[in-house]
Amino acid sequence: MNEFQTTKQWLATELGSYYSQEEAEYIARILLEEAFGQPYPMLVVSDGKVNQKIDLLKGWLSRLLGHEPLQYVLGHTSFCGMDLYVSSGVLIPRPETEELCYIIRSRGHLFPGATSIDLCTGSGAIALFMAKCGAKVEAIDISPHALSVAEKNIHRYGLEIDLQRADLFDAHFSPKCQQYDLVVSNPPYVLNKERMEMEPHVLETEPEMALFVPDDDPILFYRRIKELYNNSKVLAFEINPLCVGELRELFYDRKVEFIEDFNGKTRYLIVT
């Protein structure tokens, strides 16, 4: 084995105390590729020296063993073919949210020139996807830090997005447009009683305000969005599978479609 293979083995062994063997092997490989800017197969046949980056690797390893997500450690994540900046305090975009983006595009709800808005935008992931598809996009979040991250991502891709700081629950808030072609939101929807089922790195590092809702009113964001945007042509949401019944009742006056994610869980709601 050369230095890179030995180092990968060492990293995977250390990470094995927290991750499964498969995850540890994958993360070890990613760390080496990130540190040296080359695919792992090229590193294996190179004559490079690991000690050039060993302090960086040790620092990343320490953070990972401290339950910090890989995306925060590296400072970026992949989303719908984009490489997005992320940092602690902003929800990490999930594959489930990528699937929501592909659903709205494949069903023709997202098209060039469509007036659209992303509510609870976080890192700006959904808004960026919509803008790349040619839509006219607004994006709203209450968190100044989230908006600063979204702004960096927007600037990186040179897209036009009307980014706004706003509290949807402010009595004085009102939409800029009376009828959007498409309203999309991945709002907080995790019940507090679900905490025990969640990974420590999520609970310890990702923003609670972007995750949790009260157990006694889990659909408050959806209710408020309906109050504000029900005139819009299409509403598309990521949802909690536990709330399907309540959401069906909420949108009793519209056509609703519930869609399962790649894990077979009811994860999306399309209102037309």
Question: What do the predicted segments below correspond to?
Answer:
Residues 8, 28, 57, 70, ...:
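A general structural signal for well-ordered alpha-helical segments in protein cores
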Residues 1-57:
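A short N-terminal interaction module
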Residues 31, 67, 97, 126, ...:
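Residue-level signal for inorganic ion chemistry
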Residues 96-195:
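Conserved SAM/SAH cofactor-binding pocket of Class I
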Residues 189-220:
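Mobile active-site "lid"/loop adjacent to the S-adenosyl-L-methionine
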Residues 33-106:
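Conserved AdoMet
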Residues 215-271:
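Conserved Class I SAM-dependent methyltransferase catalytic core
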